[in-house]
Structure formats: structure tokens, C-alpha cells
Swiss-Prot record:
Full protein name: Spore protein YabQ
Induction entry: Expression is sigma E-dependent and negatively regulated by spo0A.
Pfam families: Spore_YabQ (PF09578)
Known role: Required for sporulation. Plays an important role in cortex and coat formation.
Cellular compartments per GO CC: endospore-forming forespore; membrane
Organism listed in the record: Bacillus subtilis (strain 168)
GO terms under biological process: sporulation resulting in formation of a cellular spore
Location in or out of the cell: Forespore outer membrane
Length: 211
């Protein structure tokens, strides 16, 4: 190994020492050890050191073809010590500012999307539902009114027929009148049941529309 290669190796490993110090502070800032489960923290630590080891070996492979020397560890310690004494405070301040800036930008765009996209969609859907319920209620009321008018018209038109039918029934024998009365009572009971069902459905729909 030539002196030039050794010099580049020392320089690269010192830089990697600076990188290691900054990486440790970044890792500690993002991973809150007191609030993280032990098994998850163990996995994080293992992955962190594996990534650091692979990165160190990659740099060393490009600088001196992956040869290990004692001075390499000394250069790494020198880089870490330099970071701790000169760069740590500045780096942490810059890192916290960048995190604050990223979070602020994220919150801004989140609120912007909520106000510009989501709320108008919610308001539009609410207006459509209200309009559909209003139209359904008015249509239901109109149909009920028309059916009531039709019922009254039919009753008025059928009044002569009913009157004639009653008079004809009076002329029939008693047994036949009783038979007709039973059939009429059964029909009236059936109609009452259907009427109660229609009233129940109408009440349910009216309560739903009033909400």
C-alpha cells in the first residue's frame, strides 16, 4: 500500500468517523428508546450497525481494496472525536430545524388538502343527500295527497252504488245477508291490516326524513 493510498484511507476513515457520529445522533433523535418496545429497539440497533458496517466496508473497498489496518480504527476514532467536539451542537441544531421545517410543510399541505379537496367534497355530498331527501319528501307528500283526492272522488262516485247495494241487501233473506256480512267483515279486516302496515311505513319514512 503506497503512502498516497494510506493518506486517502486515513482521510476517508476520518470522514466516516464524522459520519458515524452524525448517524448516531440522528438515530437517537428519531428513535425514542423510552417509548419503543425492547424487541423492536433491538431490531433497530442491529439494522443500524449492519448498515454502518456495510457502508464502512464499501468506502474502504473503494479506497484501499478493503485492507484493514490498525490506523483505520484510529482514523475513525479521530473522526468521531472531531465530530463530538466541533460539529455535534451545530449538526443537532441544523437537524432539528430541518425536522421542524419538514413537519411544518407537511402540516401545511395536509391542512391545504383538507380545506381545498376534502371539505368541499363532504359539503357537496351533504348538499346532494339533503336535496334528495327533500325531493323525496315532497314527492311522497304529493303522491299521498293525490291518492287521498282519488280516494275521496271514488267514494263520492261510488256512493250511489253503495246506497243501491245496501237497499238490495235489505231485500235479501237473513241467512244470505249474514253470509255477505261475514265476507265483508273479512275483507274489512284485511283492509285494516294493510292500512296499519301502510301507516307504519309512512310513519317510519316521515321520522327518517325529519332527521
Amino acid at each position: 500500500m503506497t503512502l498516497t493510498t494510506q493518506f486517502y484511507t486515513m482521510l476517508a476513515m476520518s470522514g466516516m468517523g464524522l459520519w458515524l457520529g452524525a448517524s448516531l445522533d440522528t438515530y437517537r433523535l428519531f428513535v425514542i428508546r423510552a417509548k419503543t418496545a425492547r424487541w423492536l429497539l433491538f431490531i433497530h440497533d442491529i439494522l443500524f450497525w449492519i448498515m454502518q458496517g456495510l457502508l464502512f466496508f464499501y468506502v474502504l473497498l473503494h479506497v484501499n481494496e478493503g485492507e484493514f489496518r490498525i490506523y483505520i480504527f484510529l482514523a475513525v476514532l479521530l473522526g468521531v472525536a472531531t465530530y463530538q467536539s466541533l460539529c455535534k451542537r451545530i449538526y443537532i441544531k441544523i437537524l432539528k430545524f430541518v425536522i421542524y421545517l419538514v413537519v411544518s410543510v407537511y402540516q401545511f399541505f395536509k391542512k391545504l388538502i383538507q380545506h381545498v379537496l376534502f371539505r368541499p367534497i363532504v359539503w357537496t355530498c351533504g348538499a346532494i343527500i339533503w336535496l334528495a331527501a327533500f325531493l323525496f319528501k315532497k314527492t311522497y307528500s304529493l303522491i299521498g295527497f293525490l291518492l287521498l283526492c282519488l280516494y275521496k272522488i271514488v267514494m263520492v262516485l261510488c256512493f250511489p252504488i253503495r246506497f243501491i247495494a245496501k237497499q238490495c241487501l235489505k231485500l235479501l233473506p237473513v241467512k244470505m245477508r249474514l253470509t255477505f256480512r261475514r265476507y265483508f267483515e273479512k275483507g274489512a279486516g284485511f283492509l285494516k291490516k294493510k292500512k296499519k302496515l301502510l301507516i307504519t311505513i309512512r310513519t317510519t319514512i316521515t321520522r327518517f326524513l325529519k332527521r
